Regions:
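N-terminal beta1-alpha1 ligand-phosphate binding loop
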Residues: 1-40, 46-52
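Small-molecule pocket liners
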Residues: 9, 65, 149-150
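Short, conserved charged micro-motifs
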Residues: 22-23, 73-80, 115-116
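A general structural signal for well-ordered alpha-helical packing
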Residues: 28, 64, 79-82
């Protein structure tokens, strides 16, 4: 008998397509079910949170959540699963950071850095204006902006408070505590 190596995948999920929290929450539940059906592993999910659209004023509020998935999938296979689920649920990628039926982001896979430390560090340091107009051509892990986003860190602390960012050396809890309180003031559990 051989053991299967399980990776800890951190996912962020969000929806603001309907403009109604209850409908968007239902879309997140549908996405969770699809993720569970697409893998042989475990999934732990955070509470659901109402969060302002990012950038602020760009659309209706989101319902956001995070999940920890223990699976033998590679980062690329998990990303492909997330994109397939988004497409099946009707997500069309037209506007960067625009309104969406479902958004499933692969935040991190354990302590892996992809494609390399320098590339991820470069994307982490991009000014907001550049972040809004540029998109990476390949998978970046950890997600280059997760440490700056309250709408990610608030639900992520529910399921992975002690996960440590391999570039910053900070835990999720520490990254959340380092945010400006204004960044999380409007984030509310549903």
């Amino acid at each position: 008998m051989h053991s299967v190596h399980r990776n800890m995948h951190l996912l962020a999920l969000g929806s603001n397509a309907t403009g109604e929290s209850s409908s968007n929450a239902g879309l997140l539940a549908q996405a969770y079910d699809a993720i569970k059906a697409g893998l042989s592993g475990t999934l732990r999910s955070s509470r659901l949170f109402s969060t302002p659209a990012f950038p602020k004023g760009s659309g209706p509020d989101f319902v956001n959540a995070c999940a920890v998935v223990e699976s033998d999938l590679s980062p690329e296979a998990m990303l492909a699963l997330c994109h397939r689920i988004e497409a099946e649920m009707g997500r069309v990628r037209t506007q960067r950071w625009g309104q969406r039926v479902i958004d499933i982001d692969l935040l991190a896979v354990g302590d892996q850095i992809l494609p390399d430390r320098a590339t991820v560090a470069h994307w982490m340091e991009l000014p907001l204006e550049d972040q809004m107009r540029l998109a990476p051509e390949h998978l970046l892990l950890p997600h280059p902006r997760l440490h700056q986003r309250g709408f990610v860190l608030v639900p992520l602390v529910d399921v992975a408070p002690d996960w440590v960012h391999p570039l910053t050396g900070q835990s999720v809890r520490a990254m959340l505590e380092a945010l400006d309180p204004a960044e999380i003031a409007e984030i509310r559990p549903i």
